[in-house]
Structure formats: C-alpha cells, structure tokens
C-alpha cells in the first residue's frame, strides 16, 4: 500500500495492477485462502437482493443529492475516459465486462479486501481501527480517481467511505461489496451509453438550489 502509490507518477493503471499483483501473490502464498481477504461467503440470493437494495439507496443518495451538489460547487466530473461508450453498443458491452472484472472485483479485492483489512489489523483490529482504516484507504481511493476532476475525486472518496463502512459491518462478505460496486457502476455506464440520466440531475438541482 505504501509502495504502490509511487507508481502513480508513471501511470495510474500501473499503481492499480502493481497492488493487485501483490495481493494475488499473498493470496497464492496463503494457498488461496479467500477468507483472508474477506471472501468467506458464497453468493446467495439473499446477498444479491441485499446488494441491489443498497445499490438503489446509494444511487438515490449520491446521484440525486451528493453528485448534484458537488458538481454545482466544484464543477462537473471529467468522464472523458468513458465518454466514447455513448451510443456505442460494442464499447458498452466491453466496458461492462471490464467494470465487473477490474472495478467491481479488482478494486474491492484490492482496496477493501487487502488494503483496508490489512491496515485495520495492523492498527490493532478493533472497531475504531477499522473505521480509521476505512477513512485512510478511502482517501487513497479518492485521490486515485483525481483524473475525474476535483468533484469526481471527492465523490469517489465519499462513496468509497460509505462502502468501506458497509464492509466494516460485513467483514467476511466482500462479495456483497463486489456486487454493490458492479451494479452501481453498471447503472452509471448505462446512463452514459444512453446519454441520459432521465432528467434526474435537473430535477435534483432545482430541488436543492
């Protein structure tokens, strides 16, 4: 966790894949003990339903309120890295696959399953240590998304902190976080593909200003 950010001066993807590579080496060294990274439960219907409900709540809170306010105060998000997917079905499908493999699974495995869990255990492994770890790793996660602009980085930090606090209550169920992350990003990419947020942002801005 301390070394990986240094690669950010080269390329942000190098930072991510270096950390992910280290995490997988540790996983291999533990004889693939997935429970060490918080993956101690299988996917169940209850977990899927719970993830869908949480995703819906997060979408309402963030897209309708948090995102609207941040963009009004700090400027719009820089989504140029994914704007090519607009109206592009092939690009949309490819990006969906990438999202579920590298964003949903990869980022949750690395940031929550490895960074947050390992740091919390290093600090003392009590509830306060887990919360402190959630804040620290979420700051790191937010900064790693600075390419989305200041408003984007702040939004990602707040979203990551929320997700991390959920993980604190479900320390043996990282699958729940993976599903939430995947569903949430899928909604966002679908909206970009359709070039529409169905009037939600305009309605929210009028409501909040």
What are the language-model segments listed below?
Residues 1-4, 51-58, 134-136:
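Alpha-helical transmembrane segments
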Residues 1-34, 50:
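Alpha-helical transmembrane segments in multi-pass membrane proteins
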Residues 2-11, 75, 193-204:
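Juxtamembrane/transmembrane-helix boundary motifs at the membrane-water interface
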Residues 7, 18-19, 50, 63, ...:
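Short alpha-helical transmembrane interface motifs in multi-pass membrane proteins
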Residues 20, 27-31, 62-67, 107-108, ...:
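Alpha-helical transmembrane segments of polytopic integral membrane proteins
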Residues 24, 63-64, 189-193:
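Membrane-embedded alpha-helical segments of multi-pass transporters/permeases
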Residues 34-103, 121-124, 197-209:
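Juxtamembrane helix-loop-helix connectors linking adjacent transmembrane helices
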Residues 89-209:
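Transmembrane helix-loop-helix hairpins at the membrane interface
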């Amino acid at each position: 966790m301390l070394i990986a950010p240094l690669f950010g001066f080269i390329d942000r993807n190098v930072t991510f894949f270096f950390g992910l590579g280290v995490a997988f080496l540790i996983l291999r060294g533990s004889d693939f003990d997935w429970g060490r990274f918080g993956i101690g439960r299988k996917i169940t219907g209850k977990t899927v339903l719970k993830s869908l409900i949480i995703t819906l709540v997060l979408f309402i809170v963030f897209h309708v309120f948090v995102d609207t306010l941040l963009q009004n105060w700090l400027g719009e998000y820089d989504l140029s890295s994914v704007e090519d997917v607009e109206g592009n079905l092939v690009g949309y499908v490819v990006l969906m696959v990438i999202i579920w493999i590298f964003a949903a699974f990869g980022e949750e495995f690395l940031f929550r399953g490895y960074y947050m869990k390992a740091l919390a255990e290093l600090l003392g492994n009590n509830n306060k240590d887990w919360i402190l770890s959630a804040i620290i790793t979420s700051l790191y996660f937010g900064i790693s998304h600075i390419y989305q602009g200041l408003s984007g980085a702040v939004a990602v930090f707040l979203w990551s902190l929320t997700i991390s606090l959920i993980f604190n209550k479900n320390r043996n169920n990282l699958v729940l976080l993976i599903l939430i992350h995947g569903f949430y990003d899928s909604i966002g990419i679908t909206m970009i593909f359709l070039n529409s947020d169905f009037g939600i942002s305009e309605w929210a801005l009028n409501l909040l200003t």
